[in-house]
Amino acid sequence: MFKAIKRGLAWLWKAFCYTLGVLFVVLLLYQGWFAAHIWYWAGHNPQSTSFMQARLERMREKDPKAKLRQQWTSYARISNELKRAVIVAEDAKFSEHDGFDWDGIQKALEKNQKRGKVVAGGSTISQQLAKNLFLSGEKSLWRKGQEAIITWMLEVLMDKERILEIYLNVAEWGNGVFGAEAAARHYYNVSAAGLNADQAARLAAMLPRPLYYERNRDSEFLQRYSETIRARMPSAQLP
């Protein structure tokens, strides 16, 4: 009887180890899929992102012929003013950290705890790019964990300049308006290279709520925030 129990336990242990091994291999292949895309995009421009496709689907629920406006622009042809403005507004330590701004995360947690609700995120440009490229808007521990892994991959497989270049080309600036070139032409009828400091500051200020600010361009808060960004832009460190 004891031998039978022992054999049964041994079988269960082997089955458990086998299942665990299979799950590990599946997880490894899953992460490899992300890594392969990031490695490829280090030298090639992504045609679209998960976030862009989700936006297009929502737009086509109202208009089946809806299209996104985006025109890829190289890092060198994007105004340095816009680069500075976005870094100041979204991730002041972008050139210094490894993808995670731990001080910023701590401050965001303290601010949220004080307010009793989520009022600050603390996400870096690399983290935002990870979400935009691959992930849905779902909020879960699994998604946050996957975001962290993808962020780490971005930082390992790309340099900071490439991360910022992709971010500036896939960021949303209005309903169906993606990337610096489309945003510059949509709001100011200039190229991304031709944006001045004031225009760049205003575009950067729109990033947290682009759909809202596209409809409310005279927002007093948007104006004040733009002025704050403009004043801080000289301190931005470009990669």
Where are each of the predicted segments found?
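Juxtamembrane regions of bacterial inner-membrane/periplasmic proteins
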Residues: 2-239
